[in-house]
Amino acid sequence: MKRAMVLFALLLAVTGLIAGQAGATGGATAPAATARLQTLEQDVVSRLNATRVSRGLRPLALSDDLQSAAVSHSRSMLADGYFEHESRDGSPFFVRVKRYYAAAGFDTWSVGENLLYTTGEVSAAQVIKAWLDSPSHRENMLSPAWREVGIGALQASSAGGTFGGEQTLVVTMDFGSRSGGTGQKTVKLVKPKPNPRSTPAPPPVRRLLPVTIGV
């Protein structure tokens, strides 16, 4: 059977979210910072699923493979000071994702990606709202095609390059769907939280780059 592959990549930058809470994390290995970012990741996925369920869409299962792909990209962007879907070597995002979220053994395989960074702190509700307020990001989040998701939220007290040496928090969310063939894999389901309450509107979007590729 011919393999179908669909790729969606969307990129969003916002600045100044809850700027009064900004402060150095003390490094990626600081226990408090690690726990806080893990909580942010869990809350973003829970709110994503609550939003999908409220619109009659299935919640997404948390994939360890997509999680690894997302964390890897967030770490690379902070370390090398860039904000793009492409890897630092210029290879397209789906090549990176496929290293973790394999297509081999499946008849269909598709992936998508949303990115966000902020120079301040950000809540899960604000991440979801920023993406929902962007039509292209919203379309990615609410696509009925996706079955799995992974997220990587990382922060650096001083990130160079594009980030100008400022404290920066980067969020990568990778979406995926694969089916058929012999490569079926068991995944765990993230239970959605109730619909999030309204939050203050985030700052204007500074950059948006939607990409759609079909093979």
Annotated model-derived regions:
Residues T39, L57, P92, S110-G112, ...:
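Extracytoplasmic
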Residues S68-E121, S143:
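Short, surface-exposed glycine/acidic/tryptophan-bearing loops
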Residues T25-D80:
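A short alpha-helix/helix-coil micro-patch that ends at or immediately precedes a cysteine
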Residues S54-A69, G81-S91, R138-A153:
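Surface-exposed patches in mature extracellular/periplasmic domains of secreted proteins
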Residues L7-L17:
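Bacterial N-terminal signal peptides
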Residues A19-Q21:
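N-terminal signal peptide c-region/cleavage motif recognized by signal peptidases
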Residues R3, G23-G26, Y117-V215:
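Disulfide-stabilized extracellular recognition modules
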